Amino acid sequence: MGISFSADEVFEMAMDIEKNGEAYYRKALALAKSAGVKAVFSDLMEQERMHYATFKGLREKLPPRTSLPTVADPESEEYLYLDALVKSRLFSTAREAEALAAKAGDEIEALKSALTFEKDTILFFQTMKAITDERLGRSEVDRIIEEEHRHVVRISKAIKEAEGKGSR
């Protein structure tokens, strides 16, 4: 049994991932102690909010035919990969995101969890991009990947900064 994906589904998933990322950053912000890390989480939380709105707008602008399947996956390999990624690494719900943030032992651990989430989000969207037809929204998926890449850079800098302060 195969599965097909549409550009519309990519944007729906993007919106869900951004919403869950916002929940993670909101909880991490509430638990953060240092002003610098609080600023990072606050900024990322706001960016997730903006990305959600951006992706919602992009989804609404998709031509009607992008809600139709754009690629067949007869062996369900891509589906199985994406399903495994979501179940093992990405937050399935906002509640799971908040629980992970609450479980972090310190700010650096919370930042590292955020970094893992953002990297996995990029992998997820790169796979979705690979199976979405160019004429039906692939370039729009690239926008999602670019936004998430900026998150990785921001979090990586924050980790380096926080670790530098902790080693002094």
Sequence positions of predicted segments:
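Non-heme di-metal
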Residues: M1-R168
